[in-house]
Amino acid sequence: MVVGSNHTRRGETGSRFTNSSSSSSTSGGPTASASSTTSVTSSLATNSTSTSTAAALLSSMSHKSHGPPPSAPPSAHHQTNQQHHQVAHSQPHATHYQQTNQHPSHHHQSHQSSNGSGGGSAGSGSGSGSVVSGLNGCNGSAVSRLSQSTGMSPRELSENDDLATSLILDPHLGFQTHKMNIRFRPLKVDTQQLKAIVDDFIHTQNYDIAIQRIYEGPWIPRHLKNKNKIATKRLHDHIVRYLRVFDKDSGFAIEACYRYTLEEQRGAKISSTKRWSKNDKIECLVGCIAELTEAEEAALLHSGKNDFSVMYSCRKNCAQLWLGPAAYINHDCRANCKFLATGRDTACVKVLRDIEVGEEITCFYGEDFFGDSNRYCECETCERRGTGAFAGKDDGLMLGLSMGLGLASSGPGNNGGYRLRETDNRINRIKSRANSTNSTSNSNSNTNDSTGPSETSSTNGLVASGGAGGATGAAMLPTPSQQSTGGKEATAAVSLLEKKLPNVVVSPLTMKELRQKGMTKYDAEMIMANAAYQQQHHHQHHFHHHHHHHHHHHNHGQHASTGAEATAAVQQMAAMQKPGVGGTGAAGNAGATTVSSVAAGAGSEVNGGRSTSLRKSMRVNSTSSSISTASADEVIAPVVAASISLPSKAPVVLMPRCKPAQMAIAALHQSQQRQLRRSERQKEKLTDGESSDTSSEQQKKEQKQQDHQLPQKMFSLAEEPQPEKSEEKQQEQQKRVTRNSAGRVGLVARLATAHNNNIATTTNSSSSSNKATTITNCNNHNSNNSSRINHNSNLSSRLSVKSRKPAPSEASSIPSSTSSENQQQQATRRSCSPTPAYKKNLLASFDPDPPSTQGIKEQLKDESVTYSPVKQKRSRRAAALAAAQSIHCEALGGFPTGSTGSQRKRAQAGEPTTSCSSTTISNVEPLLKTPERRLKLTLRMKRSPILDEVIELGTSLSNGGAGRGAPGSHREGTAGEGSVRSALNLTGSSSNGIEYEILRMEGISEHGNDDDEDEEEDDEEPAAEEEEEPPPKEELQLVNKKQRKKQRSRSRSSQRRSPAPSSVYGTPQKKRLRLIFGNESHTIDIPPAAAEGSGSGLDDLNSSGGGGDESFNASYASSTSLTVNTSSSSTSSSSGVGGATSTSAEPVDSSTVGPPIAAQSPSSTTSSSFQSACTSTTNSNSYFPNGKQRAAGEDSYAMHYYQLGKFAGTPSPGQGQAIVSSSSGSSGGGGSGAGFLSMPKHTFGTCALLAPTSFACLQNQPQISQQKTSSGGGAGVVPTSTSTGAVTSHHHTNNHHGQK
């Protein structure tokens, strides 16, 4: 059987693959999978096409990559840095795969799993090469023969293999290998028990006991136990095949492999455990074949997801599914084994040349399995020869590589020239040398990272493997003179490669270590290159052209403002502990880099912000199409270039992220960078949790530093924007830095809002997510800032979250202005970043951790206030109330911005604590943005919209609306939950003919709360609307249960939604919501809410308030979260949306209720609204049916009174929306309710866009807040941080809605 060139390998990291796909970087799955199923020859056409496409993409990426090593598309190439050798073969696939989502992943995955004629598993990194893939033959082993006569169907083979690998291999390896079932769910059992069974078998070698224990466990699905004897026997035999892998006499072992990019550096490989001689048969290494009909191919295979182990049989002229232990054999262009048919449907492996202990067992998948002539192959041989994915990386780099390997004196490996024969002994010597160099390299790179440019370059060498550019980026990191690095870069890259290429080959860091650093090797390389790169940019504003080469390093912000910063970043990388990864850690964990860079010097904040954004952006970009510049820097650069005409926007865009001059270059490099970031982000995503940990700590430091360095930040920004926009940027940044002037900030915010609106309008299509994010950013002003630009900010937001804690003091002084400034910039950035990629980024960037951290920080801040005795709360409320009243008055007066600004000032002055809490959030994340989170809401069309409407209207339209707005109070007042729901429903039901209720929420979350919140976040508006309205009939019955849950999520969502002051400024006139239903995504343009008096001016939030009546910005009076958009009747409901849901989940002690009531006492509507806000803050618990609701009764009455007075006749859209973001100490409610859903459909869509940040805050708050919220209204869920950031969150949410 001829190895099918298109055969894809069964990757161990099916799950990873999926992740990749979510990340876009590696997950683009090989669309060529179908083609990959075809044989090399017969399917060559298909494969060729996909391959050529991949090749083209790859080559284009390659070029970019050459220029800037960190290009995501070339990620395969770049990953080659650390993966360099490994990547060479596999990576191209990954690259191709990433790019075309077709062939590469195939190749990569294919080689591992595919047992097909294509049978090589190209990516050992993929995790499992399909030994059998090359051959269509049967398994050689007796076990394989067990099923010979009764060959399994492809579906049965897939099921049995998925189960067998999940029972035996996955527990042993510690991660989930590739699965044929793309919806495979990990067994809900204690994997330690399964691991113990395998470990015991390794000691006892007793198959019967092991199989008996496996069959007796709870992990065998019931339906498999009910199968007939033949089917049961087949499963038994397949399990035995995998157990034989652990037989002491098998002569091989399955190990984790981190070479191939396809699996994001985590796959499996087969290593020899004894010496094999030529012509030996490895009997236990068997694979099973199941012939695929075209119908079965269509039904079972999903391109780029599970077509990794499909091969084409030239003998049978059909595609075959290859599964079994041999599917984990990876491909190598100089393979030491081949597949040998042992029966009709089994194959084993025959040794082609002597294999030493510890050597990887590889097979040749085919001549064109990984693209034409295997141009995307990442195998060790291709790495050594400088071919495949490693070809054309960079002459210097390749030279360094080949020289490092001792293969040639002058890059003969590339092509041409003489070189020594590749004898086993020579190759082994090279490997041993590389190994010895590896350890040295590791220490060197760690040392060098912190030490110097050349060393950094060496660290970047990994990145450089992608090309000299990568190395240069790293090298330049330390050196300000990066312009000249072009030539130096190559040399440095070469020298570094010589040192580090071995590193790459050896894979010095374990995947675990990398993940702990929050990145994959490739990410590390890219980040290091980027960090260096950014430094280059930073140092060479003038040399943008030069930078330009490294432009994908392009995160200018990331590049250290100063050499010191660069060094700090490098050091941080070193701290991250990976020579290559360390750098990435620094850059990738921009937070880390940022921290060190911030510490480094004046430019540090820029650098820090950039690096964090870079990392996040990478993640985002991986997910997002190349369109959105994943990193804030990137986005900024392109946006800046595009919107240079918009000075305001430019400054915002430029922030520290981009230099005007670079903007033009940015446009060129952005695509590259985006791709780089894509891959990085993808990897980062995988390692997000770990990286977030490290980066969080770093970011804490960083933010502390940043807080102290805000002025420095200003300066660095000033330095950076030398071009036309530099002045504006400087000004804006300075404003940000000197967030002290709330008034100025307010003005800036307004301007930013105007600009944002313009920009948003301009970039509306892609900006839907971006705008939503902008709101989110506004909410978490500082933290979201970067986030906005980089959704990638996930990391940065995390970092920023932790930083926030340190920043609270500073926040208090700067908060108001900062938030507006940040908001402005964020909005601008957002507008800039509104590329389609942004949406992807949005989706990809939901970082449970960052938002959580952010939320926690906000919580901490709020809670710091909240923790203070209730008195503080009350005083805060009083201050907030006063501020709110004045604000409301101003707003009513029709001076939304002015009122906002003064409100902020007053709130700040009157409520320093509150202000601090609120602003801390904004202040903390000038650079960092909270990534958006994506929630998966399963919505069900409400059974009887009319009935629901009637119920909601009947339940007290006005009260219902108010209840909605003040979740606890109004609910209580009107029908409790019913009224809340009705508030949303009112908006939704009356406006929308059809309403949906949330059937199920699935979110990506790190914390239990996150899931709900995430979902809510994504669908927050719909969720709010639906949650409130979903069970109109049920609601009364299920009120307690459902409403509690809904309220909690709602309060979270509302807090998220309630547009922060930023939304007040920056909400574009036109809002866009992005709804994702299953595979469909709909973008809904929400017409600008009818400008209701000054309300429209204020923002969606305020605009829905109809002149800011209730929409005094809760964020300004951080405790005054009652951003109620009372004019619910007006279209402003879109902004109101956030408010409606803004009911704060955080319960406030009943004691709080008292103050709110007091607050209510003010007769003025503004004060009422404020009171409501306070009350709702106090009574947020009441929002949740906890008994707190009762406590909220008074509040709710007040709210009702207030809202009724306010809305009187406008009960429908969200009267009740007086958002009570009852963040316990910080009334972050800031929900602009009322108009919440003038346009329910929009609202519906908006939910998807809810910023994860608010969600994170909500989520985090539960942790912190719950401690504080004894009144277990579950309300604790709404973190104080949420409330503090509640305003922000709410605003953010509203902005989301509005912008979306």
UniProtKB/Swiss-Prot annotation:
Top EC group: transferase
Entry's localization field: Nucleus; Chromosome
InterPro entries: Hist-Lys_N-MTase_N (IPR041938), SET_dom (IPR001214), SET_dom_sf (IPR046341), Suv4-20/Set9 (IPR039977), Suv4-20_animal (IPR025790)
Feature: compositional bias, Basic and acidic residues: 677-688, 698-707, 722-735
Ranges of biased composition (kind: Acidic residues): 1009-1029
Regions of compositional bias (Polar residues) in chain numbering: 79-97, 452-462, 822-834, 911-923
UniProt name for this protein: Histone-lysine N-methyltransferase Suv4-20
Phosphoserine: residues bearing it: 831, 833
One Pfam match: SET
Provenance organism: Drosophila melanogaster (Fruit fly)
GO biological process: constitutive heterochromatin formation; epigenetic regulation of gene expression; heterochromatin formation; methylation; transposable element silencing by heterochromatin formation
Compositional bias ranges of the Low complexity kind: 14-62, 435-451, 564-574, 756-821, 1117-1145, 1161-1178
UniProt biased composition (Gly residues): 116-128
GO molecular function: histone H4K20 methyltransferase activity; histone H4K20 monomethyltransferase activity; histone H4K20 trimethyltransferase activity; histone H4K20me methyltransferase activity
Residues covered by the SET domain: 255-366
